[in-house]
A protein has these predicted regions:
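Gly/Ala-rich beta-loop-alpha elbow adjacent to hydrolase catalytic centers
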Residues: 133-142
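Catalytic histidine-centered segment of alpha/beta-hydrolase-like enzymes
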Residues: 55-57, 216-228
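Serine-hydrolase catalytic machinery in alpha/beta-hydrolase-like enzymes
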Residues: 1-127, 131
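Short beta-strand/loop motif that positions the catalytic acidic residue
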Residues: 178-180, 185-187, 191
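Conserved loop-alpha-helix segment in the C-terminal half of the alpha/beta-hydrolase fold
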Residues: 189-208
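Catalytic histidine neighborhood in serine/cysteine hydrolases
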Residues: 42-47, 205-219
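Acidic catalytic loop of the alpha/beta-hydrolase fold
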Residues: 22-24, 163, 189-194, 217-218
């Protein structure tokens, strides 16, 4: 389930990156921060869950077999073309029984299942100090995996306290009041999933600190000053006992 790594996977300390549920919405600024941490001497590994792996498999097979033809059709018939795209992907998925669990992600919250996969993933490494670096839904997943012995600290950019188009979902926040390990949440003042000020509505453990920055939920194209602020926060968090 690893997407890639920088440095050695045999180091006694390791940063594990857990991204957004939508792998297409990555952040160049956060990628740059991760690379900067590696440049300062930290080994880094990316975690890729089964849901993301399956989504990439479907997208790859679709694009190779039908992508160009459907894309041309979609230009003139967007709604029908989009439905056709999803239907084709379903048939591709049916040909891969080991991936059928992907269907479940449509009907129920999959964060706990992904967190269980993350905990199993972490046990493959000899590292005694693992730092979880996450973005958005990756923050929910990493916080649910906090109890893993090797996990030392957590950091999340844009914890998704509340989906902007949905009612409150306790599964996103109820466990946060019970967290024990240091959890740094860096929250944008324009984050539609909740700002640092909005986070005060929830019961958070004393081990959680929420720091505001100027950003939206994408945390991309950070200004030079905000980027430097984030890098200093991360480096300080990693060096403190």
């Amino acid at each position: 389930m690893t997407l890639g790594y920088l440095g050695s996977l045999n180091d006694l300390s390791l940063i594990v990156v857990i991204g957004r549920s939508n792998y297409k919405k990555s952040s160049e600024s956060l990628d740059a921060l991760v690379k900067a941490l590696h440049a300062s001497g930290h080994s880094v590994c990316w975690f890729e869950n089964r849901q993301t792996q399956t989504a990439k498999l479907l997208e790859d097979k679709f694009e190779r077999l039908w992508g160009s033809r459907v894309s041309k059709f979609c230009k003139h018939n967007f709604l029908i073309g989009n439905l056709l795209r999803k239907t084709i992907k379903i048939f591709v998925l049916l040909a891969h029984p080991t991936r059928w669990g992907y269907f479940l992600t449509v009907f129920k919250n999959s964060n706990q299942r992904i967190a269980n996969d993350l905990r199993k993933f972490l046990r493959h490494f000899p590292a005694r100090r693992i730092y979880l670096f996450s973005h958005s839904a990756g923050g929910i997943v990493s916080s649910l995996a906090e109890a893993e012995d090797s996990v030392t600290k957590l950091v999340c950019f844009g914890y998704p306290f509340k989906h902007p188009d949905q009612d409150e979902e306790p599964s996103r926040t109820a466990h946060l009041k019970k967290m024990i390990k240091p959890f740094l949440i860096i929250q944008g003042d324009q984050d539609e999933y909740g700002s640092a000020q909005d986070s005060k509505r929830y019961k958070l453990s004393s081990s959680i600190s929420v720091v505001p920055i100027q950003a939206d939920h994408g945390y991309d194209n950070l200004s030079v000053s905000e980027y430097q602020k984030c890098l200093e926060l991360l480096e300080k968090s990693l060096t403190l006992p």
